[in-house]
Amino acid sequence: FPIIYSFFNKNNSLDLKLMKEQIQLIKKIGSNGIACLGLATEVQKLSFKEKKVIIELIANNCNYKIPTAITIQGNTFDEYVKLIEVARFNQASWIILQPLLKTKHISETVCYNFYKKLIPFTKDTIVGVQNAIEYIGVGLTPKKILKLYKSFPNFRAIKGEASSVFIEKEISRYPKNLHVFNGR
């Protein structure tokens, strides 16, 4: 799925007109889906309110006619839960969870336990994780990914940010219905 970028006005507020034009262009070219709030959208720099506005902008402009993938990143566990609720309310097709990035020195165990605690809030929405060890220094090994896959029937996606050589090796270890999207 193409991902929308965050654009800003001179006063540093979101340029919703330009972002809406971006969404319309993606729809016009016949994309099979659209994503938002990933690293390209500068999600870590946005406020909760701005993230909510972008989720609603996507939903309102896609009219639920093309799948939407919403990346969730917050400053606290509670903020993650609230953003998941916003994404679900706006009928996100997929929810992609980023690790809690308070520090780049998060162990794999802490990252895994965070996802394990958070995934139940996604309920029946397809959920995945942003697994970008090479890029952001935080992520899960294939062993932990498979553990999540076996534990949650809706855990069916990974958003990678790795080289094609690295991601090819990872994909070979996963079941066919665990979708892997990669891009940088």
Task: Please identify what each model-predicted range represents.
Residues 1-139:
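Active-site beta->alpha loop and helix N-cap motifs at the rims of alpha/beta catalytic domains
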Residues 117-126, 132-184:
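Catalytic alpha/beta core domains of metabolic enzymes, predominantly
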